């Protein structure tokens, strides 16, 4: 999910930051306005769409949302970072014979690495600890995510074994902590320089 989110958000951000097309400002305004919508408003339309597609009780809803850049915060963050990169880089790449996609891959992606790591880490954190969306889209116990499985251990009708709950909580937090320490250089740089580079 994290990889799909970073790739789709980068492609959409590149389009907004570097190209002029009809309705660009309106589309960007729509993107920004979706940032203001709480998840509770979006959950019912998404649920009906995924129900009609027949992908409920699976992990496909999470993949589909990330493939189609349904997380506007990351797109906005990457747009701001890309706007801070000099356009002369694109022009010099064009003079050297690079096409649009090659310019993105060879020239801009290495410079976008801090912002992409930040977006990836945020997405991993939010997806890994997501309880509400998992509860809505997944029904089978065998497909439960860690957050849903952790909730199962807190059954009020039986005695709660706190040592199991604490052990499972540590397991739930461990991947995020490890990932943060591995990528903290890029994460801090991406947050500090988003929209200021150039």
Where are these regions (language model features)?
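A structural signal for multi-pass alpha-helical bundles of membrane permease subunits
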Residues: 1-198
């Amino acid at each position: 999910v994290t990889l799909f989110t970073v790739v789709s958000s980068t492609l959409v951000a590149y389009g907004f930051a570097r190209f002029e097309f009809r309705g660009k400002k309106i589309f960007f305004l729509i993107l920004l306005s979706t940032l203001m919508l709480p998840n509770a408003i979006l959950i019912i339309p998404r649920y009906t769409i995924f129900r009609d597609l027949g992908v409920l009780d699976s992990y496909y809803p999470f993949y589909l949302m990330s493939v189609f850049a349904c997380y506007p915060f990351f797109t906005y963050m990457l747009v701001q970072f890309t706007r801070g990169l000099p356009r002369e880089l694109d022009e010099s790449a064009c003079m050297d014979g690079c096409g649009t996609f090659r310019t993105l891959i060879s020239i801009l992606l290495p410079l976008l690495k801090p912002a992409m790591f930040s977006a990836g880490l945020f997405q991993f954190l939010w997806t890994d600890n997501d309880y509400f969306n998992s509860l809505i889209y997944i029904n089978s116990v065998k497909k439960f995510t860690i957050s849903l499985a952790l909730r199962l251990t807190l059954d009020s009708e039986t005695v709660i074994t706190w040592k199991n709950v604490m052990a499972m909580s540590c397991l739930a937090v461990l991947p995020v902590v490890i990932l943060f320490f591995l990528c903290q250089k890029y994460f801090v740089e991406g947050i500090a320089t988003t929209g200021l580079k150039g």
